[in-house]
From Swiss-Prot:
This is Calcium/calmodulin-dependent protein kinase type 1. It comes from Mus musculus. Activated by Ca(2+)/calmodulin. Binding of calmodulin results in conformational change that relieves intrasteric autoinhibition and allows phosphorylation of Thr-177 within the activation loop by CaMKK1 or CaMKK2. Phosphorylation of Thr-177 results in several fold increase in total activity. Unlike CaMK4, is unable to exhibit autonomous activity after Ca(2+)/calmodulin activation. One of its GO terms (molecular function) is calcium/calmodulin-dependent protein kinase activity. The lineage of its organism: Eukaryota, Metazoa, Chordata, Craniata, Vertebrata. Phosphorylated by CaMKK1 and CaMKK2 on Thr-177. It is found in: Cytoplasm; Nucleus. Calcium/calmodulin-dependent protein kinase that operates in the calcium-triggered CaMKK-CaMK1 signaling cascade and, upon calcium influx, regulates transcription activators activity, cell cycle, hormone production, cell differentiation, actin filament organization and neurite outgrowth. Recognizes the substrate consensus sequence [MVLIF]-x-R-x(2)-[ST]-x(3)-[MVLIF]. Regulates axonal extension and growth cone motility in hippocampal and cerebellar nerve cells. Keywords: Allosteric enzyme, ATP-binding, Calmodulin-binding, Cell cycle, Cytoplasm, Developmental protein, Differentiation, Isopeptide bond, Kinase, Neurogenesis, Nucleotide-binding, Nucleus, Phosphoprotein, Serine/threonine-protein kinase, Transferase, Ubl conjugation. Ubiquitous.
Length: 374
């Protein structure tokens, strides 16, 4: 691995298992595995991103970019890079573990959910993304699956994860690589035009839309038609799903989901909008409608997300049950670690004695089954 990345020197480790106990597979990527592990010295739980060097041939720049981005970030709503280890065949990124589960799961589990709850969530995302933008970092893949709760506490903060597609901007530069998740990418990305930080603001608008109704603003079984909708910024606030949502919330979304990136709100402008900074977000309970739509449109079997946050949640709940129950084998639904999905770790993952095979990424997630369901 070239050593051009800024930051502390990578620590050497012949066998990472001498330092950490591996507990579970949390996810797989194109050339990495994410493992739930425990520091043998401190008993602290962490997420370790294990990257096989042989899978990085020709991709060193991409990996170094991600590490460079992570090294610069210190924000309470962004998953932190704690340490880096290197062995002969692997690179290990020791990441802060977030154990509160996924955004959609928490909303569905709630008995009460309001516009104000959504506003507080979006405030945290905006504040974190503004911080990134001030550092010259564009995330480029903001979506609900990358928003995780820090802990199981009811008032837990939200955390932004997954910086695999993030990019450092040079002053005055524009980006041009088409990347991101189709339903959340800005029109200028699909149009293959040069783009900037404004793409993240568009994605936040899409997330806000979903948080208030439970379904995506753009949907079609045909990708070409889906892209056409996004390119034209054609979306609606459908009745009856939006009947109880404030005009202020809709105005906020319109400013973020603005087709013209020059007219689109920046994070700073969005943070000053009355729906975020003022008192216009309603307190009416919209849980039933939103949770029903989330369950219909974002079923777990369709997400196929690369990060198994459920495994972390179950592990944390197991710890909360206490050692006496564990000793009696009373695991129950909350006290049992998930087994690795799809029949076990991906072939060649770092929790075995070999390396990740190049290009062994998960298939892309299919679109939701319906844009809005009765």
């Amino acid at each position: 691995m070239p050593g051009a990345v800024e930051g502390p020197r990578w620590k050497q480790a012949e066998d990472i298992r001498d330092i950490y106990d591996f507990r579970d597979v949390l996810g797989t990527g194109a050339f990495s595995e994410v493992i739930l592990a425990e520091d043998k010295r401190t008993q602290k739980l962490v997420a370790i991103k294990c990257i096989a060097k042989k899978a990085l041939e020709g991709k060193e720049g991409s990996m170094e970019n991600e590490i460079a981005v992570l090294h610069k970030i210190k924000h309470p709503n962004i998953v932190a890079l704690d340490d880096i280890y290197e062995s002969g065949g692997h690179l290990y990124l020791i990441m802060q573990l977030v154990s509160g589960g996924e955004l959609f799961d928490r909303i569905v589990e709630k008995g009460f959910y309001t516009e104000r709850d959504a506003s507080r969530l979006i405030f945290q995302v905006l504040d974190a993304v503004k911080y990134l933008h001030d550092l010259g970092i564009v995330h480029r893949d903001l979506k609900p699956e990358n928003l995780l709760y820090y802990s199981l506490d009811e008032d837990s903060k939200i955390m932004i994860s997954d910086f695999g597609l993030s990019k450092m901007e040079d002053p005055g530069s524009v980006l041009s690589t088409a990347c991101g998740t189709p339903g959340y990418v800005a029109p200028e990305v699909l149009a293959q035009k040069p783009y900037s930080k404004a793409v993240d603001c568009w994605s936040i608008g899409v997330i806000a839309y979903i948080l208030l109704c439970g379904y995506p603003p753009f949907y079609d079984e045909n990708d070409a038609k889906l892209f056409e909708q996004i390119l034209k910024a054609e979306y609606e606030f459908d009745s009856p799903y939006w009947d109880d949502i404030s005009d202020s919330a809709k105005d906020f979304i319109r400013h973020l989901m603005e087709k013209d990136p020059e007219k689109r709100f920046t994070c700073e402008q969005a943070l000053q909008h009355p729906w975020i900074a003022g008192d216009t977000a309603l307190d009416k309970n919209i849980h039933q409608s939103v949770s029903e739509q989330i369950k219909k449109n974002f079923a777990k079997s369709k997400w196929k997300q690369a990060f198994n946050a459920t495994a972390v949640v179950r592990h944390m709940r197991k710890l909360q049950l206490g050692t006496s129950q564990e000793g009696q084998g009373q695991t129950g639904s909350h006290g049992e670690l998930l087994t690795p999905t799809a029949g076990g770790p991906a072939a060649g993952c770092c929790c075995r004695d070999c390396c990740v095979e190049p290009g062994s990424e998960l298939p892309p997630a299919p679109p939701p089954s319906s844009r809005a369901m009765d």
